[in-house]
Amino acid sequence: MVLSQRQRDELNRAIADYLRSNGYEEAYSTFKKEAELDMNEELDKKYAGLLEKKWTSVIRLQKKVMELESKLNEAKEEITLGGPIAQKRDPKEWIPRPPEKYALSGHRSPVTRVIFHPVFSVMVSASEDATIKVWDYETGDFERTLKGHTDSVQDISFDHTGKLLASCSADMTIKLWDFQGFECIRTMHGHDHNVSSVAIMPNGDHIVSASRDKTIKMWEVATGYCVKTFTGHREWVRMVRPNQDGTLIASCSNDQTVRVWVVASKECKAELREHEHVVECISWAPESAHPTILEATGSESKKSGKPGPFLLSGSRDKTIKMWDVSIGMCLMTLVGHDNWVRGMLVHPGGKFILSCADDKTLRIWDYKNKRCMKTLGAHEHFVTSLDFHKNAPYVVTGSVDQTVKVWECR
């Protein structure tokens, strides 16, 4: 590339300034003589530090170019994977596509949980900043903040109508919110340590919670009384989730096990122990996934009767496991994440599993073939939570980078 006379003169003056300001006197005087520079103090102020500025801006631009190239490659891949035909793709096969539709800021600490509202076009996020925030996922607008907890909010859960929201916190309480008036209508005390997980039961009459005090408790929504305590885990209980009809609850713990409990009798129906580290998260597979699961695993479970139920678990051992609860067996292990798995769920269409992890990615698994079919660099930091909308083509993720991201699926 040939420089014009003016550009050459500017470059020479910038080099001369660099040599002089860094004390290379001999090189400076030789260069000045050879480049035939007439150094003028006023004129030279313009070139002070210019070489370093240009150098750093070149590096910055190079980084930007690389980022844009990778986005371009991603976009090309999207097109070859069925850009124009995407319209014809069956909604059961919709998966999140980069880049995100919205990156929402507002929390002042890591985001711990994100969930969609079952009816309205809003989603809710919980954070270590002790707040719960409500956002419109279609417009990306922030709607309101629910304040009441005095420490990190660890988990949130809607009832099936979306009129009630339950939250739990490191402040050792569980709160029930009227999601129409956005007021806290009840605070439940009873755990002796950080309450790490909460879920409203499918019938809407009870709430289950899990705590660092090693117990799981069941609470009556109408009164706020604790009506049952499930004991058995030997360490911090990380998460609790009821199955679809509310007859079973699953829990996972720092003791590296997953347990399944019969709600009516409080007995532990299964203790699933194959993970090699803390089990961070669990998720029940919906019935829509049962045919694919049976096909993928050739599971022997109740060939005559109803299959399953099936449960997913994600661990700090970086794996996701699928279990047939009726026989207490691990059906498959998905390996691919490079760090702790923090969340996973079965795609509403039943064919895929989505997961997020501390490797900052969101992954889509074709579990029938036990392979990761897509990896999205989702956040700048650990991805702590994800949710897939049951009817609309959206996925939401939350992260330690304090943002909530909305991903469109197609």
From Swiss-Prot:
One of its GO terms (molecular function) is dynein complex binding. Residues 7-39 form the LisH domain. One of its GO terms (cellular component) is centrosome. It is found in: Cytoplasm, Cytoskeleton; Cytoplasm, Cytoskeleton, Microtubule organizing center, Centrosome. Keywords: Cell cycle, Cell division, Coiled coil, Cytoplasm, Cytoskeleton, Developmental protein, Differentiation, Microtubule, Mitosis, Neurogenesis, Repeat, Transport, WD repeat. The keyword Transmembrane helix does not apply. It comes from the Eukaryota. The keyword Repressor does not apply. GO terms for biological process: cell differentiation; cell division; establishment of mitotic spindle orientation; microtubule sliding; nervous system development; reelin-mediated signaling pathway. Residues 56-82 form a coiled coil. SUPFAM superfamilies: Lissencephaly-1 protein (Lis-1, PAF-AH alpha) N-terminal domain (SSF109925), WD40 repeat-like (SSF50978). WD repeats lie at residues 106-147, 148-187, 190-229, 232-271, 274-333, 336-375, 378-410. InterPro entries: Dynein_regulator_LIS1 (IPR017252), G-protein_beta_WD-40_rep (IPR020472), LIS1_N (IPR037190), LisH (IPR006594), PAC1-like_LisH-like_dom (IPR056795), WD40/YVTN_repeat-like_dom_sf (IPR015943), WD40_repeat_CS (IPR019775), WD40_repeat_dom_sf (IPR036322). Regulatory subunit (beta subunit) of the cytosolic type I platelet-activating factor (PAF) acetylhydrolase (PAF-AH (I)), an enzyme that catalyzes the hydrolyze of the acetyl group at the sn-2 position of PAF and its analogs and participates in PAF inactivation. Regulates the PAF-AH (I) activity in a catalytic dimer composition-dependent manner. Positively regulates the activity of the minus-end directed microtubule motor protein dynein. May enhance dynein-mediated microtubule sliding by targeting dynein to the microtubule plus end. Dimerization mediated by the LisH domain may be required to activate dynein. Can self-associate. Component of the cytosolic PAF-AH (I) heterotetrameric enzyme, which is composed of PAFAH1B1 (beta), PAFAH1B2 (alpha2) and PAFAH1B3 (alpha1) subunits. The catalytic activity of the enzyme resides in the alpha1 (PAFAH1B3) and alpha2 (PAFAH1B2) subunits, whereas the beta subunit (PAFAH1B1) has regulatory activity. Trimer formation is not essential for the catalytic activity. Interacts with dynein, dynactin, nde1 and ndel1. Belongs to the WD repeat LIS1/nudF family. This is Lissencephaly-1 homolog A. The gene is pafah1b1-1.
